[in-house]
UniProtKB/Swiss-Prot annotation:
Record organism: Leuconostoc citreum (strain KM20)
Function: Endonuclease that is involved in the suppression of homologous recombination and thus may have a key role in the control of bacterial genetic diversity. Acts as a ribosome collision sensor, splitting the ribosome into its 2 subunits. Detects stalled/collided 70S ribosomes which it binds and splits by an ATP-hydrolysis driven conformational change. Acts upstream of the ribosome quality control system (RQC), a ribosome-associated complex that mediates the extraction of incompletely synthesized nascent chains from stalled ribosomes and their subsequent degradation. Probably generates substrates for RQC.
InterPro entries from the UniProt entry: DNA_mismatch_repair_MutS_C, DNA_mismatch_repair_MutS_core, DNA_mismatch_repair_MutS_sf, MSSS, MutS, MutS2, P-loop_NTPase, Smr_dom
Protein name stated in the entry: Endonuclease MutS2
Record field: compositional bias (Basic residues): 701-710
Binding site for ATP: G336, P337, N338, T339, G340, G341, K342, T343
The gene coding this protein: mutS2
Family annotation (Pfam families): MSSS, MutS_V, Smr
MF terms (GO), sorted A to Z: ATP binding; ATP hydrolysis activity; ATP-dependent DNA damage sensor activity; endonuclease activity; mismatched DNA binding; ribosomal large subunit binding; rRNA binding
Smr domain mapped to chain residues: 726-801
First-tier enzyme category under EC: hydrolase
Family classification: Belongs to the DNA mismatch repair MutS family. MutS2 subfamily.
Region feature Disordered, mapped onto this chain: 696-721
Length: 801
């Protein structure tokens, strides 16, 4: 992309706003080097990065990066085996800690809902190389201010402890001078430092009272800074300890530097990745500041900007417009008077196209589409004074000439006031010739002009559309609204009349205007009036649609509340029934136990008992039980509904009260429903089968149930003799658990100590259900899978109480 268009369209002003959000030198460098590109894949990749960062910024407050220093010089010094200072190591430590933080941040998001929505950045984060041991070692040794901690080494802590003790001894000795009888010999009763040694400010005439060493004197010579003889030895010891401290500090710094040296390449790569994350963070926060959104990219250069405004204008003050180019026409000619907003409109198209091709979000209120232009040219500049008009015209023409040789069918050309600055007749003719030349090269064009001759250009040229800016004659002010398909209307006479010119002047001016011009202006006025009428009708329809949608939502909410209340009533009734059945079942079990004892006392063996007779009533009671836990199971409910509904079913859509036919099921829990001539997607919860469909399915289910009953009757007769094995293979989950419940009753009454339940392996769902059932059943003392040679985990052995 040529640099001139970036300057003309003020691209750098957009880039400079990124700097407000950057915190790393690498991120700042990447922002400074940002340029629009024409590689579609790269543009989409950049936009995907920005989209990820926008989502993270909205849900997580952004990627948690600290303000980092430039550690490139430090890495170079490490590569030549130099030792870093404590401050430099502190800056390295901050980079290492940020690396660990960012890597952990993205790992945690992968386990959250946001992780499924991120497309690009998590993969980049996987390239970060964390050095946890080294990071921890440096963090322990050096604090955030760049000072070596006492914990950096045992020897350093030992030396510093001795320094602290010696300093305290010196201070105690010196305080004896400042508080005792000798205080009268001091200029001030304080202890100060000269040449790294503790001294007293002694009056010159009392020098002999202290002995020791004079290290300095005041400017007047009346005060001498004396190190008393009594503390000379302590100060000497203190100096020696400080030398030891410096030596140990240097040793620690060399050791830490040597630890980092083998990892300079990984750290440099981390710096690049962190800087890039800083850059995409800035793009996301710029999008938030501008209230911008992600554009779609069209490789055929069909541009469709919906409610777009210039990003350098205040959104609350700017007028948003729809701007479309490339779909049916490749040129837009905006005609009309100056100060109506023509220039800002074409600049908006240009700057948003540059932003999108740089991976930045664009300032539109609705989803919009941009093209991918290999080159964008712009000739924009206000008309100058009469004295400068020749030079202005010449510079514009020179600029256009330089474009012509580089224009092709992948180029967007922007002209502002084409042909201005010279004789109007020649300027209009030249403008038409230039537009024809650019069109012959296949370029996409948007141009502004106030020449009336170009109003007919859009009607006489293929793939060309007229446009204008709306002017409110009643207020004599431009509205800055962009109107496509209608050329600019001349409002000079209307404005003159409103400003007070008499009918004689207006009439004379009208008479001097050609009939063609009057007809054209009248045609434009009629088109504008029709557009306004259609727009008002559209607004009315939109308001009516919103009211209808609001009413529909209210009815849907009312329906949901009714369904919730109905479900609660049914559930309460079922729970009450369960309590009654449980009490009755307990009585029945007690009666069965008493009958069994009576028969045993009468001399009958357990094997002679008619278990079918004893269990008949109990099974009837079991059948009455309403399994509230299964009713509450949303997964089972969804599975049941999915099995109950099928394509071709006649159904009723509850929210509309309309009958229809199911066409096909979609993966998002919705069905495609045909209602008369309409086809629409409806939530599965909103669908109820019609009575005819339900009866047909009940008939099929009844026939199937009769087959199952016959099978179970034969199986039940076999189990009546209380066999020690129950085979549940091929039985549906719920039916299998009910059958297991009945079998355990039979086995307990038959005094069976151990039973075998065969459930097979399959998906493991039935095996897990049997295991859960046995775990919570009081009749089961213990259970385990069968031996490997006896079925393994395809069968469970249960020991009964």
């Amino acid at each position: 992309m040529n640099n001139k268009v970036l300057q003309t369209l003020e691209y750098d002003k957009i880039k400079l706003q990124l700097n407000d959000f950057l915190s790393t030198p690498t991120g700042l460098q990447e922002a400074n080097e940002l340029q629009p590109v024409s590689d579609v894949d790269l543009i989409n990749h950049w936009l995907a990065e920005t989209a990820d960062a926008v989502l993270i910024d909205r849900l997580k407050g952004g990627i948690p990066l600290s303000k980092l220093s430039d550690i490139t010089p430090h890495l170079k010094r490490l590569n030549i085996e130099a030792s870093l200072s404590a401050t430099e190591l502190s800056e390295m430590s901050l980079v290492l800690r940020n690396t660990s933080t960012i890597a952990s941040f993205f790992e945690q998001m992968q386990d959250e809902a946001i992780g499924e929505s991120l497309r690009v950045l998590p993969e980049q984060a996987k390239n970060l190389v964390t050095l946890p041991d080294i990071t921890r070692q440096i963090q322990i040794a050096i604090d955030s201010s760049g000072r070596l901690n006492d914990e950096a080494s045992y020897e350093l802590k030992h030396v510093r402890d001795r320094i602290n003790g010696t300093e305290q001894a010196v201070k105690n000795q010196m305080q004896a001078y400042t508080r005792g009888k000798t205080a009268q010999y001091l200029s001030d009763p304080i202890v100060t430092i000269r040449s790294d040694r503790y001294v007293l400010p002694v009056k010159a005439e009392y020098r002999s009272q202290f002995g020791g060493v004079v290290h300095d004197q005041s400017q007047t010579g009346q005060t001498l800074y004396v190190e008393p003889q009594a503390v000379v030895t302590l100060n000497n010891k203190l100096s020696e300890l400080r030398v030891q401290e410096q030596a140990e500090e240097q040793r620690v710094l060399q050791e830490l530097s040597a630890t980092l040296a083998p990892h300079t390449e990984e750290i440099a790569n981390n710096v690049t990745i962190l800087g890039h994350f800083d850059f995409v963070n800035a793009k996301a926060r710029l999008a938030a500041r501008l209230d911008a959104m992600q554009p779609m990219v069209n490789t055929e250069n069909k541009v469709d900007l919906q409610q777009a405004w210039h990003p350098l204008l205040d959104k609350d003050l700017a007028v948003a417009n729809d701007i479309a180019l490339g779909d049916g026409y490749k040129a837009i000619i905006i005609t009309g008077p100056n100060t109506g907003g023509k220039t800002i409109t074409i600049k908006t198209l240009g700057i948003l196209q540059l932003m999108a091709q740089s991976g930045l979000f664009i300032t539109t209120k609705r989803p919009s589409t941009v093209g991918v232009f290999h080159e964008i040219f712009a000739d924009i500049g206000d008309e100058q004074s009469i004295e400068q008009s020749l030079s202005t015209f010449s510079s514009h023409m020179a600029n256009i000439v330089s474009m012509i040789d580089r224009i092709d069918d992948k180029t967007l050309v922007i002209f502002d006031e084409l042909g201005a600055g010279t004789d109007p007749a020649e300027g209009a003719a030249l403008a038409i010739a230039i537009l024809d030349k650019v069109a012959s090269l296949g370029a996409f064009v948007i141009a502004t002009t106030h020449y009336p001759e170009l109003k007919l250009y859009g009607y006489n040229r293929p793939e060309t559309l007229n446009a204008s800016m709306v002017f409110d004659v009643s207020t004599l002010k431009p509205t800055y609204q962009f109107l496509m398909g209608v050329p600019g209307q001349s409002n000079a006479l209307a404005i003159a009349k409103r400003l007070g010119f008499g009918d004689d002047v207006i009439g004379a001016a009208t008479a001097l205007t050609s009939d063609a011009d009057q007809d054209l202006n009248q045609m434009i006025a009629d088109l504008v009036a029709q557009r306004d009428a259609v727009k008002q009708h559209d607004v009315a329809l939109s308001e009516q649609l919103k009211a209808t949608e609001k009413q529909s939502e209210a009815l849907s909410e009312q329906q949901r509340q009714l369904e919730k209340e109905r479900a609660k009533i049914v559930l309460d009734a079922k729970n009450e029934a369960n309590h009654i059945v449980a009490a009755t079942k307990k009585q029945a079990e007690q009666m069965i136990s008493e009958i069994r004892k009576a028969r045993l006392n009468a001399g009958q063996s357990a094997g002679e008992l008619s278990e079918q007779d004893l269990q008949a009533k109990k099974r009837q009671l079991d059948g009455l039980r309403q399994n509230s836990s299964l009713e509450k199971n949303k997964i089972l409910q969804k599975a049941k509904r999915a099995k109950q509904l099928a394509a071709g079913d006649e159904i009723t859509v509850q929210s509309y009260g309309q009958q229809g036919t199911l066409i096909k099921q979609h993966s998002n829990g919705q069905w495609e429903v045909e209602m008369g001539i309409l086809k629409m997607l409806v939530d599965e919860d909103d669908i109820v089968k019609t009575e005819a469909t339900a009866k047909a399915q009940q008939s099929k289910a009844k026939q199937k149930q009769q087959k199952i009953v016959k099978t179970k009757t034969a199986s039940g007769s076999a189990r009546a003799t209380a066999k020690s094995r129950l085979d549940l293979r091929g039985v549906r989950y719920e039916a299998a658990l009910a059958e297991l419940d009945r079998y355990l009753d039979t086995a307990v009454l038959a005094n069976l100590g151990t039973v075998e339940i065969i459930h097979g392996k399959g998906t493991g769902a039935l095996r897990q259900g049997v295991t859960e059932f046995l775990r919570s059943d009081r009749r089961v003392k213990a259970y385990h899978f069968a031996n490997a040679n006896a079925g393994g985990d395809g069968a469970t052995i249960a020991e009964l109480s």
